[in-house]
Amino acid sequence: PAMHEYVADLESWYEDLQELTPKSWFRLEDVPNEGPFIVKGKTNSRKDRWKNLMYAENKEEAINISCELMCDPLLSKQGIVVRKYEPLVTFDEDVSGRPVTEEFRYFCLDGKILARGYYWSNFSDSLKDAGIYPDFSEEADQLVLRALEKIKGKIRFVVVDVAKTVEGKWIVIELNDGCMSGTSDVPLEELYDNLYKGLVDENILENNLV
């Protein structure tokens, strides 16, 4: 379906959200020499190999990673994109060395926020024990609403991932199909209750955030 194709291809939604998300290049010849960069498929990435198949210090490394990803059975069918690496507020790192950041996942329907939660659910307990589990941000909420307005009519049920940079700015990291996304730390009862209400009675979501 057109809605899934739109949200599953970064190049499709990038034009609508380029003011809110990291600079991206879809042709290697357009990538500047100075990095760092993130290299991924237009839909998926090799997060499990962050240090050698996702993060690139410069254009040469980005090209080398792109060549490897073009041989990947899944990513080669999507096309490869190079994105500007934005340093994010970081609490830890996962087993691949990928930064565990101040990032949230939002489930949204028809331009309204249904529910939101911390993205890195595998680290929730350790961050809570350390007293650094992040709180929700009004600024992040407003960013999501701006993004939803810009993609209005393109997709109904969408996931928006946002994160905070070290400079204190919130940015859109990714869009995903709401039907195919993990729930992270999003409260399930709240999500499914509001999703049901939104589908049964579109007038029940009177506010931007239930």
Language-model features: where?
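Short acidic-glycine loop/turn motifs at beta-strand connectors
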Residues: C108-K112, T165-G168
